[in-house]
Amino acid sequence: MSRKQAKLQPRREFLKLAAFTGAAALAGKTAPAVAEPPGPAPAADAPASDNKMEFLRVSGRQIVDAKGNRVRLRGTCPGGWMNMEDFINGHPGAEHTLRAQMAEVLGPARAHFFFERLLDYFFNEDDVIFLRKTGASVVRIPLNYRHFEDDEAPFKYKESGFSRLDQVLRHCENHGLYVILDLHSAQGWQNVHWHSDNASRISLLWTVSSYQDRYVALWREFARRYANRAVIAGYDVLNEPCSNNEIGDYPFNIYSNYRPSWDRINSLFRRVVSEIRKVDSRHIIFLEGDNYAKQFMGFEKPFDDNLAYSSHNYTVPGFGPGQYPGTVHPRSATGSGSEEWDLAKQERFFLDAEGTKFTQQNNVPLWVGEFGSVYNGPPDENPDRLRALDDQIGIFERNGAHWTTWNYKDIGVMGMLTLNPASPYMERIGDLLRKKRALGTDDWMKWLPPTPVKDATAQLAGQILQVVGDSQIDPGLNARCVSQALLCFYTGTLMQPLYAGLFKGLSETEMDHILSSFSAKQCVPNHGLVNVLSKYMAKPA
């Protein structure tokens, strides 16, 4: 295939998929060359759209509309839009340090242009139409607080962030797609990982009252603005909280050694729900379990009549490598294992999960806010990953769980849409991606084969442990923590000037052309994934 043919291919693929889903309207839309200036934020009492979307509420273990009809929330998450992540967008390190490096290298004005264009192209009306035509009923939008509030000006809210969110809310309203607002990156960081825009490996939200005050106040502001917007299905008030490892990930406080601080998380969740209810009595509020949405059994019983709960349900066969059903070989920092997985084991995994048990015991809805499979491992194993995902969704459906996949769009890892490898953006960052892969900076991608740098890091972790001489420290967990600290956080941030330098000296027109690679019509659909999701999304509630 010639380069010209490769560049035309994503549009052809997009239009083929549009025809498959009935989305012929997609063919006529293009992203603007220059974004319109943001308009004023709509008032909280803005009228509903012509779609007559209805407020949703909790009724026992179900979610229903105003007439009491059952509603099933099925959809995805546009991670990488208003909360960037390294493996989704292609950059190294955390978003806020990347923005600082881009401003340093490109200058503040050109860096601002870069990020605004990325936001313009990454998720817009074309994407909303695409999702509706696949059958999605909801989109969970991950948000970084920095779009709405600056650390230098706490409690002063930025209309630019609300205006951008409002624009997408209007698109969703016009096309009948419900929205769940997800605070993915909170003030002071609710966990110690990169996906909360954290470059420090510490978490301050749980111990610093000023961060808690700002977090609660921001949610009150969201609720004040959107109290009368039926397009919003609810508020996911905190993504993947981790209430009790504020010093960072260490072998003694992760995985089976993690112990939630139930007093902290129960207190903060009660406070934020109370503050929201002062201005918004109608929207569902979703609470995620502690320890990255996995632990629930220390939660208070539901204390509001419109609460639902959210777990995350990533499973080994969705990542591989290996066959499904059959033997899967999950990788760790110190080697690979072997596990047998099939439908029955996936079902046991789901039914044994604390989120499943808690919601059953308390007669409240369960929403699996994140789960997914990956497609950048061995290409011949992609059918195995799809079979695992298909079985997983079938289990959710049989048990009445609502669900949203992770992730909607990315650079070729797990998205419904992926950037074309021949696109201007992917060609420009190709060498950097190879360096990232060699250095193991994307901590998420643990399923890929180890590189010499990863092996050397594991050896270093072993040498550290040998000198420390504490036999109680698990070698695998130690290697995992050393790798994350050294490669994801330190090395990822170290590489950010290299990423910024790739865009130095470009005109705004050139930059716009490169970033248009993120537009829906230039992306390549993952047809296998879309077909699996559409099969379930199109089903009645």
Q: Each predicted region: which residue ranges?
A:
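N-terminal secretory signal peptides
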Residues: 1-10, 17, 21-24, 34-37
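C-terminal segment of N-terminal export signals and the immediately downstream linker at the start
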Residues: 28-53
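N-terminal carbohydrate-binding accessory modules
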Residues: 44-136
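Active-site region of glycoside hydrolase catalytic domains
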Residues: 58, 189-335, 354-374, 398-404
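Aromatic- and acidic-residue-enriched carbohydrate-binding clefts of CAZyme catalytic domains
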Residues: 92-114, 154-159, 191-209, 252
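An active-site-proximal structural segment forming one wall of the substrate-binding cleft
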Residues: 117-137, 156-185, 197-234
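Aromatic-rich peripheral "rim/lid" segments of glycoside hydrolase catalytic domains that contact
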Residues: 378-541
